[in-house]
């Protein structure tokens, strides 16, 4: 699906190595390309590399050897990060996990001590057992936009794997701050990205429920993912229109319900529990000293100030737009959005 001269270079490589199989299709995004590769793959393991990064020439052979040695369902290596402009390695961002093997991983350990809860969100540093992906019909969701497909695939695939392996070797080189890269373009927070994040979370929750995996770890993960939209140095919620704010809050309510937030609320860390409570119980702007105190607290530095700033914004929205509270059945979106999980 490339629109440049990539195909010409691939033909030259195929002339040098007959094992290379070329696939050509209309450019439909990275997920469609990966799915085409998965459908055509016939090997024991499969891997996915981003087009503007590079890797150690022995990366896949070393991952493959390690996977065979441990009979692993998924094996992951470490990675370097380098600057796009200078090729300088950024040591602070280097990821080198300790060698570890777990032969009985379980989604019940999500975000606790299990190895799979600590795995990197990206797919490019891993090999996946092909038969495992096929057995569970796992493919990338073509309805999700750039930046969401890797993490979504990981959260669908890894819980199916029971034998997980880390090797400490840094064999992948991830390009940072690349002007034309997909990851750079998707890092800018927007209302559409907020909606997309909720859509992704609802999709994952639905998938986990069907597998019988639902637990507090997934709910905590969701709260942590949406936190920057509400509580950060420059929260997107403050920049939304009133209709967009109401849409975001309605989506939160839907996620809270589907992820069984009431059941798992007590398991959240302190600030995440505060945010969940805040989003669930917004009240109108208080009168008198209460109004003054809320305004003053919103100016405090750090996390506390951001929390009160969000509380103040929610109170103002509640007073002006939704005096009767946020009700899903009365929700309206500034742009069409289907809250049902997209199909594979």
Where are these regions (language model features)?
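Membrane-interface aromatic/basic loop that binds lipid-linked glycans or pyrophosphate carriers
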Residues: 72, 235-344
């Amino acid at each position: 699906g490339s629109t440049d001269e990539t195909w010409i270079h691939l033909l030259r490589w195929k002339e040098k190595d007959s094992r290379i199989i070329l696939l050509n299709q209309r450019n439909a995004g990275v997920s469609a390309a990966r799915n085409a590769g998965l459908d055509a793959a016939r090997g024991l393991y499969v891997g996915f590399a981003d087009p503007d990064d590079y890797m150690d020439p022995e990366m896949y052979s070393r991952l493959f050897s390690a996977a065979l040695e441990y009979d692993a369902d998924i094996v992951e290596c470490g990675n370097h990060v380098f600057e796009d402009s200078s090729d300088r390695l950024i040591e602070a961002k280097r990821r080198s996990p300790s060698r570890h093997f777990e032969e009985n991983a379980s989604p019940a350990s999500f975000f606790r001590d299990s190895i799979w809860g600590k795995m990197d969100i990206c797919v490019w540093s891993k090999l996946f057992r092909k038969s495992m992906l096929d057995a569970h019909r796992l493919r990338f969701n073509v309805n999700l936009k750039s930046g969401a497909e890797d993490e979504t695939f990981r959260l669908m695939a890894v819980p199916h794997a029971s034998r997980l392996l880390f090797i400490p070797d840094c064999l992948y080189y991830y390009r940072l701050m690349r002007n034309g890269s997909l990851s750079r373009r998707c890092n800018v927070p927007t209302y559409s990205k907020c909606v997309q994040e909720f859509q992704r979370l609802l999709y994952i929750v639905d998938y986990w429920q069907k597998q019988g995996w639902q637990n507090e770890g997934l709910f905590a993960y969701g709260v942590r993912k949406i936190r920057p939209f509400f509580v950060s140095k420059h929260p997107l919620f403050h920049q939304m229109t009133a209709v967009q704010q109401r849409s975001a809050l309605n989506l939160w309510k839907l996620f809270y319900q589907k992820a069984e937030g009431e059941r798992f609320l007590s398991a959240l860390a302190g600030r995440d529990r505060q945010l969940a409570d805040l989003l669930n119980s917004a009240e109108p702007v208080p009168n008198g000293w209460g109004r003054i105190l809320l305004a003053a607290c919103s100016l405090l530095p750090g996390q506390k100030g951001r929390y009160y700033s969000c509380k103040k914004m929610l109170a103002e929205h509640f007073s002006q737009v939704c005096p009767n509270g946020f009700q899903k059945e009365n929700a309206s979106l500034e742009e069409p959005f289907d809250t049902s999980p997209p199909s594979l």
